[in-house]
Amino acid sequence: MAKTIKVTQTRSSIARLPKHKATLKGLGLRHIRHTVELIDTPAVRGMINQVSYMVKVEE
């Protein structure tokens, strides 16, 4: 089974760069305290790094 990570949005996407809003949407995050479980891939890690100031990651 593939390794998964839990990603939780901790800050609002209001007044953020459109690119960062699109990244949150790509991760499947919709609002503050929304948590999704994603497969740990380099693409997902890159998206998380881009919006690291708005999300919390649990291995």
UniProtKB/Swiss-Prot annotation:
Gene Ontology cellular-component annotations: cytosolic large ribosomal subunit
Record-linked PROSITE patterns: RIBOSOMAL_L30
Disulfide bonds: none
Matches recorded under InterPro entries: Ribo_uL30_ferredoxin-like_sf, Ribosomal_uL30_bac-type, Ribosomal_uL30_CS, Ribosomal_uL30_ferredoxin-like
Gene Ontology terms, MF aspect: structural constituent of ribosome
Keyword annotations: Ribonucleoprotein, Ribosomal protein
Pfam families referenced in this protein's UniProt entry, alphabetically: Ribosomal_L30
GO BP terms in the entry: translation
NCBIfam families hit by this protein: rpmD_bact
Record text on subunit structure and interactions: Part of the 50S ribosomal subunit.
Family under the similarity heading: Belongs to the universal ribosomal protein uL30 family.
HAMAP family attached to this UniProt entry: Ribosomal_uL30_B (MF_01371_B)
Name of the protein: Large ribosomal subunit protein uL30
Source organism of this protein record: Actinobacillus pleuropneumoniae serotype 5b (strain L20)
Lineage: Bacteria, Pseudomonadati, Pseudomonadota, Gammaproteobacteria, Pasteurellales
Gene responsible for this protein: rpmD
